[in-house]
Structures are given as structure tokens and as C-alpha cells.
Design a protein with these regions (language model features):
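Class II aminoacyl-tRNA synthetase catalytic cores and aaRS-like
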Residues: 9-570
Length: 570
């Protein structure tokens, strides 16, 4: 029942807006503060309202070239909608009513009546529904409107002169725009073409949209999607699905943790010492205490304090902040899950992470085998591969790389590792050691090539200051990283709980920091004191929620974050 002319109309509307914006950009734009511009827009709104109040028509209330208020004022399309809002207020109609008699969702009406009515069938069932107007068609004494619910479910509304009267129909045609939230109440019927519809006996604007929607039949550009995510949610089902799938994924993680008797806690975002991961922190200042603080890079040290306090299984899902680069798998603000299990180790926590990922795939997509955005399938089921960092690097280089086991067993020298890195063109750090070079060399050969789920085990001690030393391998710690589709998804440890060794590790990190390593962590004396009280042996894990969604869907990190951070245009 929908005519193709609506798509054309939406496209023309979008082009008009773009044209207006281009004209504004090309014109000489006066310097104006944010407050000044906001006040100017309010003055323009008031001027439009005054014209309407004095009896002007909608067209007469609009200033197409913005001659009065200049290029930074409302474009013509917005002015027209502001004028309609003014006309509603003049007529005593609330453009943003507090409540409406909504008796059913669009999805509920669809579920109850889809396939039950033949073309032309009418029921006496009256429903009150509301949704966003995506299409409008004027057929004289009958108007058709398509309403969309937040989940994308759509239904047709029919507004008839015979049912609501000539004045109400005229008002409908005059006031309702694409993008408005509209309430209609009436009987459920099937149109002559068989379209499930609500035949309106009454209607009301639930929220007047002053900003026009873009052309919904066109793909959104990346700039609009990231700068105006709310537009993306309206226009693109994939974006709405990502929001829902993310919520389902977090709910699944919480359920699996609950099944294993883990307790969820919240730890500080503002910290006096940055630690828990090797990363550059964001800094801030607390005026009340005249105290410099860090936005946390990880909750690890506080969660371990919970183990000291007797909470043997603990997890947190929350935000972390790292003042580093941005790419397809990294964002400065992201969501992490970290968990710690007393009397566990990196083997038991690895088994838990595997279950967490597999349960999430099952709960979100109904299978361990998921379909990515590019149409390919990825299987999280079955057994997962395990490799050793040192063994796999030795194999790739064709020579044995030996861990740094201390003064009596120094292993492969930093100088030799540096020569290999230079020969291969591997990027080197300003402050480097055996462990950093080993990891950089390993990443050169393997990082983006581990497609199937793979645990990479047994890391250099220098790069893992919070991890317990390996039970049988000097210079190595009991740590794994989980790689999926060529990127790191999660990490897990046998947690270091010896306060003397932990102090030694902190001192080594602090020396690196003094030498210029911005990712090295500080010495946290309060944490060392807590370890001195006694922390049981434990396994710990960390996994990015954003990265989990990347793994499950094939999206970029920006596509998994509902409101990603973007650099302002001005």
C-alpha cells in the first residue's frame, strides 16, 4: 500500500537539508560563542512563534534565506517544524504531552493479528499505539502513515476524514512530519491490500521532531553514524541489533558468573595510583583535596583486595580508560570484565573464559557458530588451541629464544633480540627489555594470524608485573592471552600473591617509568600492605566487552560502542 514516491520525498528532503548546510558553510560565518548561538536560535524560535501568534501561515513564518538571523540560524526545514510547534501551542495542543493512552506495543499488535486477517477484514478490537513516523501518504480523504517501534517493528495507520472529521484530518496533514512520534487509537483492520492497520478514531503527536531525518533509503555515512548514533539507531537495523546484542552479551556474562558463585562488585574509577595494566593513564585533579588523580586503567588491584578480604570469587563489569591510540580494536574509553577466583590458577580461569565466551555466543545467537557481518561463519565450539610464546617464537625464528631467568640464567640477550628486531623491521620501544622485545617479535609473526580461538601461554616476567612466576620455567610467568580472529580478546593469570616479589616487580616498573616508559605502573604501597595481610592463590582474567562483540559480530570497536568518542568538528 506504500507508494515509492515516499522514498523520493525523503531523499529530496535530505538533499534540501544538505544544500542548506552547504550554503551556510559557503557563506561568511560570523564568530559566535556557543551561548551566543543558543540565544540566537531561541530568538529565532520566538520570532517564528510571534508570527504564528499574529496569524501568519506556516510558509509566512519561515525565513528561507535566513536573512534576519544569518547562516548559523535554523535551516528552512527546521524553521517549518518550529512553526508547526508554535501553531500547536497557539491552538492549545501540547507538542510534547506527558502521557497518552497507549494500550499495546506495535510488536504486540503484530504478534496477535499477523496472518489472522484477510484483505478488507475489520475487527472491533480497539488499540492505542505509538511510534515514529517513517512514511506518510496523502490520498485525499484518507492518509496512510507507517509507524515504527524502537525495535524496528512497523505497522500502518489509516487516518480517514470519515472517521475523524474534516478538521482533524486537515490538522493531521498540516502538523505531522516524518520523524514525529505519533499516537493513534482505533480498530485493528486489514486494508484492501491486506496490510495490517490501525484505523484511527483519534490521533495525537506524542513528540514533535524539529530536526528532519536523513534519507532512510540510503546508507548512513560513517561520520553521521559515529557523531549522531541516535540517527543510526533509527535508520539502520544493524545498529539497533548491536545495542541489543551487547545488552544480551553482558547479561549472559553475569549469568555465567552467577552460576559459578561469583559476586559482582564496583571499584573506584578515580585512583591515586595507576596500576593493574601496562597503559598510559588519563589524569585529572580533585579540587576538594587538591589531589591529582588517575582515571583507572584497570580494576585489578582493588578486586584483589576483595580476595584479601575474603570474597573468594569476584568480578566487575565497568569502564576503563587508557590514553593511547585509537584503531579498529582500541578505544580510549571501553568496557572490561575482570574476575578473580581464589584457589584457582591460569588453567582454571582459562576454562572459565572459554565457557563465558561460548555461553555468550549461545545466549546471543543461539549457537557456538556465529555469522559475522561480512557473511562468514566463525565457530567458537570444540576444543581451543594452545601454544607457548617462547616455543612458537623460537619456531618462527629458527633458533631457540631462552627466557631471562635472572643473573645466573640470563637467557637470550637484549642485544641479540634487538638485532633480530632491527633485521625484521620490528618497531622498538624507547625503554626496552628482554620481555618487551620478545613480545614485539612474537606479535610480528603471530598477532594477526591466529584466526581460530588460541591461548598463547607463558609470557616474559618483565612485561607481567602482577603475575605469579611459572612453576617450572625460570623467567616466565603463568599468563595467557586469548586470540580470536587475529586480535587479543582476553588475558588470564595465575595471580602473584607474594608481597616481597610484588614489591620487586613494582620497583622494576618504577625504574622503567623514571627512564621514560609512560606505560609502566606506579608502586602501590597500599596494595602491597593488603597483600601482606594474605591473599589466597588465585586465577584472574580480563576481557573487553567491546572486543567480545567484535569477535562475535565482525564489527569494529566503534560499531560495538553505542556512543563512541569522536573528535569535535570545531
Amino acid at each position: 500500500m506504500w507508494c515509492s514516491g515516499f522514498s523520493v520525498h525523503c531523499g529530496l528532503m535530505s538533499e534540501t537539508i544538505e544544500s542548506q548546510e552547504n550554503q551556510n558553510e559557503e557563506a561568511a560565518v560570523p564568530a559566535m560563542t556557543t551561548v551566543e548561538r543558543a540565544e540566537m536560535l531561541l530568538q529565532q524560535d520566538a520570532a517564528i512563534y510571534a508570527k504564528i501568534n499574529d496569524g501568519a501561515t506556516l510558509d509566512e513564518a519561515v525565513d528561507p534565506g535566513n536573512k534576519e538571523f544569518g547562516p548559523l540560524a535554523h535551516p528552512e526545514q527546521v524553521q517549518m517544524r518550529v512553526a508547526k510547534r508554535a501553531m500547536m501551542l497557539k491552538d492549545g495542543i501540547q507538542p510534547y504531552p506527558v502521557t497518552l493512552d497507549v494500550t499495546a506495543t506495535i510488536e504486540e499488535v503484530r504478534a496477535k493479528y499477523d496472518g489472522k486477517l484477510e484483505a478488507g477484514d475489520e475487527t472491533e478490537d480497539v488499540v492505542g499505539i505509538a511510534g515514529r513516523v517513517l512514511f506518510l501518504r496523502n490520498a485525499g480523504g484518507l492518509c496512510f502513515v507507517q509507524l515504527s517501534a524502537g525495535d524496528g517493528t512497523k505497522i500502518q495507520g489509516m487516518i480517514s476524514k470519515k472517521e475523524i472529521g474534516a478538521d482533524s484530518l486537515k490538522q493531521f496533514k498540516q502538523l505531522v512530519d516524518l520523524g514525529d512520534h505519533l499516537f493513534i487509537k482505533g480498530r485493528v483492520i486489514a486494508s484492501k491490500t491486506g496490510e495490517l492497520s490501525v484505523f484511527a478514531a483519534e490521533w495525537a503527536i506524542a513528540a514533535k521532531a524539529l530536526q528532519p531525518l536523513p534519507a532512510l533509503h540510503k546508507d548512513l555515512n560513517e561520520d553521521t553514524r559515529t557523531r549522531k548514533p541516535y540517527i543510526g539507531m533509527i535508520a539502520d537495523e544493524k545498529i539497533r541489533n548491536m545495542v541489543r546484542n551487547r545488552s544480551k552479551a553482558v547479561a549472559s556474562l553475569r549469568k555465567t558468573f552467577a552460576d559459578h558463585d561469583f559476586l559482582e562488585v564496583e571499584t573506584p574509577m578515580l585512583q591515586t595510583v595507576h596500576g593493574g595494566a601496562a597503559a598510559r593513564p588519563f589524569t585529572t585533579h580533585m579540587n576538594a583535596f587538591d589531589l591529582d588523580l588517575y582515571l583507572r586503567i584497570a580494576p585489578e588491584l582493588f578486586l584483589k583486595r576483595c580476595l584479601v578480604g575474603g570474597i573468594d570469587r569476584v568480578f566487575e563489569i565497568n569502564r576503563d580508560f587508557r590514553n593511547e591510540g585509537v584503531d579498529a580494536t582500541h578505544a580510549p574509553e571501553f568496557t572490561m570484565v575482570e574476575a578473580y577466583q581464589a584457589y584457582g590458577n591460569y588453567d582454571t580461569i582459562g576454562a572459565l573464559v572459554k565457557q563465558l565466551v561460548q555461553d555468550t555466543a549461545m545466549d546471543v545467537f543461539g549457537s557456538h557458530k556465529v555469522t559475522l557481518l561480512d557473511g562468514t561463519e566463525y565457530d567458537f565450539g570444540g576444543e581451543w588451541k594452545t601454544i607457548s610464546m617462547y616455543d612458537s617464537l623460537s619456531e618462527a625464528l629458527g633458533e631457540e629464544i631462552v627466557p631471562n631467568g635472572g643473573p645466573d640464567n640470563p637467557g637470550t640477550s637484549v642485544g641479540h633480540l634487538g638485532e633480530i628486531a632491527d633485521k625484521l623491521g620490528v618497531e622498538r620501544d624507547d625503554v626496552e627489555n628482554h620481555g618487551k622485545l620478545v613480545e614485539h617479535l612474537w606479535e610480528h609473526f603471530y598477532e594477526d594470524k591466529l584466526y581460530e580461538p588460541t591461548f598463547v601461554r607463558d609470557f616474559p616476567v618483565e612485561t607481567s608485573p602482577l603475575v605469579k612466576g611459572h612453576r617450572s620455567k625460570a623467567g616466565v610467568v603463568e599468563k595467557w592471552d586469548l586470540y580470536v580472529r587475529g586480535f587479543e580478546l582476553a588475558t588470564g593469570y595465575s595471580e602473584l600473591n607474594d608481597p616481597v616479589v610484588q614489591r620487586e616487580r613494582f620497583v622494576a616498573q618504577a625504574k622503567d617509568a623514571l627512564a621514560g616508559d609512560e606505560e609502566a605502573c606506579d608502586i602501590d604501597e597500599d596494595f602491597l600492605e593488603a597483600l601482606g595481610v594474605g591473599m589466597p592463590p588465585a586465577g584472574g582474567m580480563g576481557m573487553g566487552i567491546d572486543r567480545l562483540l567484535i569477535a562475535l559480530t565482525g564489527a569494529t570497536i566503534r560499531e560495538t560502542i553505542t556512543f563512541p568518542l569522536v573528535k569535535p568538528l570545531n
